[in-house]
């Protein structure tokens, strides 16, 4: 019984700890989300949350009014010589 309680506590801690991670960009580098406001391509819908937006693989920035807050990231390109 004690072992079961320990596993349950561990599971609760892991789930609670992972909820803060959702606010980070999922699989995106910070530079990919440095999209100028005038060229943002909408990736969300009205009232989309940052978590929902990031889970779609998009960037979220609500600091600039009247532009898409949930937008497609820049594509990283490889240098070819």
Swiss-Prot record:
Keywords: Cytoplasm, Disulfide bond, Extracellular matrix, Secreted, Signal. Residues 1-22 form the signal peptide. CDD domains: Trefoil. One of its GO terms (biological process) is regulation of glucose metabolic process. Residues 31-74 form the P-type domain. Disulfide bonds join 33-59, 43-58, 53-70. Expressed in goblet cells of the intestines and colon (at protein level). Expressed abundantly in goblet cells of intestine and colon, and at low levels in stomach. No expression in brain, lung, spleen, kidney, uterus, pancreas, liver, heart or thymus. InterPro entries: P_trefoil_chordata, P_trefoil_CS, P_trefoil_dom, P_trefoil_dom_sf. Disruption phenotype: Mice lacking this gene show impaired mucosal healing after injury and die from extensive colitis after oral administration of dextran sulfate. One of its GO terms (cellular component) is extracellular region. It comes from the Eukaryota. It is found in: Secreted, Extracellular space, Extracellular matrix; Cytoplasm. The keyword Nucleus does not apply. One of its GO terms (molecular function) is identical protein binding. The keyword Secreted applies. Its main location: secreted. It holds the Pfam family Trefoil. Involved in the maintenance and repair of the intestinal mucosa. Promotes the mobility of epithelial cells in healing processes (motogen). Monomer. Homodimer; disulfide-linked. This is Trefoil factor 3. It comes from Mus musculus.
